[in-house]
Amino acid sequence: MKNIISSPVEVPLLLPKHNTNPATRPQTSQTTRILLLLLIAISSSLIWLRPTKPYPSTSNSSAFKHPHERNPSYLVSGKNGVVASEEARCSTIGIDVLKDSGTATDAAIATALCVGVVNSFSSGIGGGGFMVIKPPTGCSTKPCSSRTPISINFRETVPDGDYYQAEFYKDPSKSRTGGLSIGIPGELAGFQAAYQRFGGGVSWQRIFQPSIDLAKNFSVGPALAVVLSDPRIHPWMKTKTEWQSVFQPNHRIAQLGDWIQRPNYARTLQIIADHGIHPFYHGSIAQQLVDTINRHGGRVSLADFQTYQPIIEQAINTTYHNYNIWTTGPPSSGAILLHAMNILERYSLHDHPRTPLAEHRFVESLKYAFSARTELGDPKFMNSSELARMDLIESKPYGLKTSLKIDDDRTYDYSHYKPKYSIVEDHGTTHLSVVDRFGSAVSLTSTVNLYFGSNVMDPINGVILNDENDDFSIKGRSNAFDLYSSPLNYPITGKRPVSSMAPIIVDYLHPQPSNGSLVEPEFFCALGASGGSRIFSAIIGTLLKLLWGYDLSHAIEDPRLHHQLLPNEVYVETSYRSDFLDSLKSKGHNITMIDIFYGKAAIHGIHKRLSEDTLFGSSDSRKHGVPDAY
């Protein structure tokens, strides 16, 4: 049974279920409207009366909401399963799959497909990403006989050809829009690989059906409405027939609550539900995509689709005291996240109250982590010395050595941290987390990169294609700090670009008893984020707050700070604690205040208190997320 924990003055304004029809929706009475307005007014007044000190540890189900003016996040709880995503309808679709005996992997795929329908600006089967899967308890079959988490890298790849570097150097805009910006999509291949290993509680068709139905007719949700209101997308969206037919249902760009249809995309999902991914990589859909990409200036062949393969391997990990953190390897930023946690381990931050000094150390760890990120690349294209360097960066001794360089009294200019190359800033993405009653967990991040990817939609199958080639470095280009682009991230046939994505699953390692019996690690949390280069700073900050005793909703909603070394600025969200801010300024940090909705990272996660059975889920209000549980 799902419990929604909220303060008594807050009224959940949930979107309708995915099968709601506008003709049958109940009408709100005038009396109800008045009551809602009164409750909102009372809530607004109480917000200003709430303290802004750190949230205390919550030991029961009565939790405060974060005192922000935006809609608060929901904290849901259940003992059988939780799905946390950026869209209420998609979280519910995932829970419905779990209720039908689906696994966490089944539910994660169903949820991700749904997000690709209703929030197609950030993800979809025309994109790719990374996931970490923790196998279920008691599984004896080969893929999960060990409970060691695995990672699936379904990042997009560069099509065959040696002209991308020269084309992007001559005209960098070609890496952002049009056919040359498109990498070979990996999402469906990644989903099939996950389903074959850890899915099957429900059929492949059952996983796809809710999104097929949804694509035929759905209302514009808050996240999509925000993106569609951005005037930067209007010029091209209003001039392309295939986009007009979907996003201009009333001869204007759709707005919140408008009903839109994606019938071509629904048919494509139906084909994949009936026949698997073969049509997408080897058949008619693949040929349609090849033709569309090339018509928009690309140079791909059917062979580029036919040869695409996801990469399945053991997840990489580090320990932070008694917590085992599992994530995805390069070219994701999982290794960089682990490096930051290794830097911070010496301070045992979780054993002490949150202080201004702890915030300074956190910022410094980010600056060193982003310096290390400039040496990231696709391992398949790295030589032995480059691979050894990446192994060193992930290691405990290197993290400790780096932590000893942190000065508790001051910060430094970027050159002190010795970045080797310039930093490529990526964008977009969606994240979701799922835990089921079998003890399996999935942390999945997917993207089409910039809003609506390459701005190319196939007119026949409705697939919106990524612009992932924009995440590569351009040879010969230097940035404003005279740092040149990284040769480790140049576009080469088959290569996957560097990404900020870093989904994590964290277990607690119980002390082993003296009698020699083994105590299995206990699930602690699954976290991940959307938001480009702000992703892993948001994940680390949220994880630290969970370790400080915050409940999940508070850990996610608390104002954040972010530093990516270049530019040498600490980006601080409004409502951040003023005493912490003053301390950072006193140590020489350059502060830039940002609106909570500008350049945001959105965290969607699941948490379990140690030695308890209840799972808690929360989705970030920065992207209007709503979780579900039962």
Question: Predicted regions span which residues?
Answer:
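Short, low-complexity, Lys/Arg-enriched N-terminal segments of secretory-pathway carbohydrate enzymes
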Residues: 1-28
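Terminal signal-anchor or tail-anchor transmembrane helices
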Residues: 30-54
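Noncatalytic scaffold domains of N-terminal-nucleophile
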Residues: 48-51, 55-96, 104-275, 280-282, ...
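Internal maturation/activation junctions in enzymes
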Residues: 61, 251, 349-448, 461, ...
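Alpha-helical support elements that line or immediately flank enzyme active sites
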Residues: 97-98, 189-197, 275-282, 287, ...
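Active-site rim segments in enzyme catalytic domains, especially the processed small/beta chain
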Residues: 117-140, 148-151, 299-301, 440-517, ...
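Short, small/polar residue-rich loop motifs at catalytic or cofactor-binding pockets
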Residues: 312, 426-429, 451, 499-501
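Extended C-terminal subregions enriched in glycine
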Residues: 495, 539-540, 548-598
